[in-house]
Amino acid sequence: ASDVYKRQGYNYSSTSYPKMDRFYGELEGYVPTKGGIANIDLKRTAFGLKFIVTPPIDGTLSIGSYSLNPNIKVSADDSTLETSFMCTFQQIYECWQAENYTQDFTIILTWNRVNGATQTFEKIITAKRNVMTTINVNVNGSSTDSSLGVKEEDTPMGSENVDMNFNGGDLDDNEVNPSM
């Protein structure tokens, strides 16, 4: 279990997800040979989130999460905000093994209204390996007029091949003659 801290009005876990792209791969059974090439197939072990936030009709809307920490704030006078980022899954090995790896996260909307009221809404979203998930956020005048829509982008992030070529040299011993 991790400790929960307070930061800028959000609760978040000390086990947050790094905002970076990451790839993982393994090479088994390779026997080095002269002129041989070791190719390692890498898989993305990250997911993407894209927030499209329509400003509230009054007050300030904050978007948080217990572990993702997006730190998004939009006021009534702001323009529609569009921001995206990638995060690395914590269970890298499990993510690499499973083609359709997913994990659920709770997105928290906190709406501080101009009349002093604070409304909070939560929705669980599912992040998928190698998928940019678009989260459309819209809050309106009453507590029943709010929505948090989640749309999975149709286009894949794509794949990249990385060739890792190493020249280990020969395995002959080199005589070392120290000079004094």
Model-predicted regions and their roles:
Residues 114-180:
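Hydrophilic extracytoplasmic domains
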Residues 2-46:
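Short, low-hydrophobicity acidic/polar segments
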Residues 2-7, 60-132, 174-180:
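Tryptophan-paired
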Residues 42-57:
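A short, Gly/Thr-enriched small/hydrophobic beta-strand-prone motif that recurs across taxa
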Residues 30, 64-66, 169:
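Generic beta-strand hydrophobic packing signal
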Residues 54-70, 137-150:
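Repeat-unit-sized solenoid/scaffold elements
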